[in-house]
Amino acid sequence: MADPIRVAVTGAAGQIAYSLLVRLASGQLFGKDRKVELKLLEIPQAMGPLEGVMMELQDCAFPTLAKVEAFDNPEQAFDGINWCLMVGSRPRGPGMERSDLIKINGPIFVNQGKALNRAAQDVRAVVVGNPCNTNCMIAAHNSDVPHERFSAMMRLDQNRAKYLLASKAGAQVIDVTNVVIWGNHSNNQVPDFEFAKIGGKPVPEVIADAAWLENAFMPTVQNRGAAVIKARGASSAASAANAALDHVRSLITPTPAGDTFCAAVMANGAYGVDAGLIAGMPLTSTGHGDWSIVEGVPMSPFIKGKFDAVLDELRREREMVKDLLPG
């Protein structure tokens, strides 16, 4: 059997991690024939609850779980890891603006970016903790790990969009392909129904209802997180954990011919995105943890206008944290 895959998970005592860790430990991501070692990171005051999470993982007696350890120091947690799932971030409190959240979380991702220098040479970092695009940018700019090893999660938005399109068309989710969420994981994201396909046909041909696509589908995807909070009194956890697994799976599995997946990556000029910004893009992978941007996706003036607006939002976020970006 191959060596175990070493995976660090930050925010490991939180709700997303609670849904994520059991599936990760049970072999649902890397397979039943590959053992995993989990290195769980939390803040010192959460080490008690994290001990309980560790006990539960141990009590599952998964054959695929080789080891589980708890840390409150990122350098120790990231030592020798192959994957880093950066789930932890300070949540938005009452009366907090997004700008407040960005400034509070920035220093956390500076430290974690530097700590990633202790990881294995093939490490990949996936940022889930919000605001994930800008947190990912901060971590990448503060690490010696190549920038193409970093990505931020847009997969929950992609999955939400796929479900809504399939439901409206009376199709199966598996029939929906090429869903792109352009830009930022915020309520200004751009769920692109024009490039998406259902059963191999462009969505506007299958769902010939422009008013629904523009005025119902897009806002529903953009505001789904808030709707979940309103309904259950807590933010998305199980669906976010599932999306994180889907995100990694798309990086370790060759992309099916003719399809794409979506994640936020350092675009460096593609589609006019400023160098250094982390933006949602259409991607493919060879299945070796890599990604390539799919160039040449057409944008109507409607989609392009919204994309330009969300790029401005990402630029404003970068300006807020410019003192945390070396060079």
UniProtKB/Swiss-Prot annotation:
Binding-site list for NAD(+): G11, A12, A13, G14, Q15, I16, A17, N105, Q112, V128, G129, N130
Keywords recorded for this protein, A-Z: NAD, Oxidoreductase, Tricarboxylic acid cycle
One family name in Pfam for this protein: Ldh_1_C
Xref: InterPro entries: L-lactate/malate_DH, Lactate/malate_DH_C, Lactate/malate_DH_N, Lactate_DH/Glyco_Ohase_4_C, Malate_DH_type2, NAD(P)-bd_dom_sf
EC number: 1.1.1.37
One GO BP: tricarboxylic acid cycle
A single MF term (Gene Ontology): L-malate dehydrogenase (NAD+) activity
Annotated substrate binding sites: R92, R98, N130, R160
Catalytic center residues: H185
Reaction(s) this enzyme catalyzes, per UniProt: (S)-malate + NAD(+) = oxaloacetate + NADH + H(+)
PANTHER family the UniProt entry points to: MALATE DEHYDROGENASE
Family label: Belongs to the LDH/MDH superfamily. MDH type 2 family.
Function: Catalyzes the reversible oxidation of malate to oxaloacetate.
Protein name as annotated: Malate dehydrogenase
